[in-house]
Amino acid sequence: ESKMNKGDSKIMKTVYTCFCTDVIHEGHLNIIEQAHKYGRVVVGALSDEALIRYNRFPTISFDERIRMYQELEGVDEVIVQDTIMYDDVIKKLKPDYVVHGDNWREGAESVIRENVLSLLSEYGGELIEVPYTYNEEVKKIDSTLKEKLAMPEYRRKRLKQLIKMCPVVKTIEAHSGLTGLIAEKTVVEENG
């Protein structure tokens, strides 16, 4: 059964976006608002395993994240995205549009963006990039989450999750706050 746009006889188009967050802020709401202008909004909830492999560790359960996304105004459906790459979702859903912040044009996420563009080009889907929202509120939320994840109980939880998921876990030992900070902030980009 297709949803119809209010006052419109056309079948609504499908718009897909993926979230990998435990806290909804202005930027996420902006993504939903922009996506809703184009049609029926389907939000992909990145699974815990995909989040952890992407080096983002959840502070709330997967079910809580799904409920949080479902309760957002403008979201029509929430599905699971099992990998950081969009292949399975795009091949199955064939969205007319994928909406994402423009922050993935450079850096490590640019590979994901290029993959999405390639998948969409196979059937005429379009990528809509929304200017990334980065203001004081967003900075504060990011900072609070980083502080929370730095707490020993969350670090132990992350290590247990990694050991459970991966047969080989890469770790680095740090003997001071400074070396710990260096280890935490180090990013290796391959082929870029």
Description of each model-found segment:
Residues 2-153:
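Nucleotidyltransferase catalytic core that binds NTPs
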Residues 28-37, 180-191:
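Short amphipathic alpha-helices and their capping/turn segments at secondary-structure boundaries
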Residues 149-188:
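N-terminal amphipathic alpha-helix/helix-capping segment at the start of soluble metabolic enzymes
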